[in-house]
Amino acid sequence: MRTFFVTGTDTGVGKTICSRAIIQALQEMDTQIVGFKPIASGQDEPVYADSLDDPKNDYGDEDNRDVLILQNSTKENVSYRDINSYTFLQTVPMITAEKGRIKLEKVDRDLARLAATYDVVAVEGSFGWLSPMNERFTFADWVVKHNMPVIVAVGIKEGCINHALLTVQSVEKMGLPVLGWIANRINPGLSHYAEIIDVLSSKIAAPLLGCIPYIHKPETQDVGKFLTNTEQLRHIQTLLAK
C-alpha cells in the first residue's frame, strides 16, 4: 500500500495545506513522498486562448495554486504534470461540459507511475468526499476502487462538526479506514475553537494528527510541525510501507 487519500469536509477547508503538512511530516521521517492532485480547477490567471481552442489540451496553463503547493512541498524533483492529470479553468469541471474530458484511465496511469517511483503518494481530492469526479464516478467511488486509506481535513468553522462526522461516517461505511484527521483553523475569529476540537475528538474514533493554526501564507511555511501525533504518523508510515 503506497497511497492514501486526503479528503475534506467541504471546499475551501485547506485540503492542500493539510496535504502539505503530511508530506512535510513524513519527509522528516525519511519517507520519499509526493503529492498528487488528479483534477485541479479554478486557475489564478485566465487561460490562454489557444489552450481553450484545443479540445485535446487539458491545461489552460500550469498555474493551479493547489498543484503548485504540492509541487513545492515535496523534496522530490517532480514537474507540474507529473502530479496532476487535469487542470481546468472552470471551478467545477465535473458538472460542466468539461466532465466528458476527464478519463479515469489517465488518472489511474498517472497514479500508478507515481506509486511505482516513490515510497508514498498523498492523493488530494477536489471539493468533498462524494463530489463527482467525472460523468459516472464520485471521488469516493474511485478511492474505494483503489482501496486507499483516508485522512480527513477538517476546516474548523461553524457547521464543521456535522460536516466532519458525516464525512467520516461515509468513508467508514464504504469500507475504508480513516487513518486520522487534521484540524485546520480557517477562521481566526471563530468562538469556541477549543471546544469544537474537543467535540470532534470525542466523536471521531480516528486519531487527531494535529491542529494547524491560522497563519499567514501557510503554503510557504513548515506546517508539518503542527502534526504532533508522532505515534500515529509512525503507524501511517509503517502501514504505507507494506
Swiss-Prot record:
Stored HAMAP family: BioD
Any one Gene Ontology molecular-function term assigned to this protein's record: magnesium ion binding
Location relative to the cell: Cytoplasm
Keyword Methyltransferase annotated: no
The protein's name in its UniProt record: ATP-dependent dethiobiotin synthetase BioD
GO cellular component annotations of the record: cytosol
Keyword hit for Nucleotide-binding: yes
Binding site for Mg(2+): 16, 66, 124
Catalytic activity: (7R,8S)-7,8-diammoniononanoate + CO2 + ATP = (4R,5S)-dethiobiotin + ADP + phosphate + 3 H(+)
Role noted for this protein: Catalyzes a mechanistically unusual reaction, the ATP-dependent insertion of CO2 between the N7 and N8 nitrogen atoms of 7,8-diaminopelargonic acid (DAPA, also called 7,8-diammoniononanoate) to form a ureido ring.
Complex formation: Homodimer.
CDD domains, sorted: DTBS (cd03109)
Functional pathway: Cofactor biosynthesis; biotin biosynthesis; biotin from 7,8-diaminononanoate: step 1/2
GO biological process, one term: biotin biosynthetic process
Keywords of this entry: ATP-binding, Biotin biosynthesis, Cytoplasm, Ligase, Magnesium, Metal-binding, Nucleotide-binding
Cofactor(s) of this protein: Mg(2+)
Enzyme Commission no: 6.3.3.3
Taxonomic lineage: Bacteria, Pseudomonadati, Pseudomonadota, Gammaproteobacteria, Pasteurellales
List of catalytic residues: 37
Stored Pfam families: AAA_26 (PF13500)
InterPro entries linked: DTB_synth_BioD, P-loop_NTPase
Binding site for substrate: 41
Similarity remark: Belongs to the dethiobiotin synthetase family.
Positions bound to ATP: 12-17, 66, 184-185, 213-215
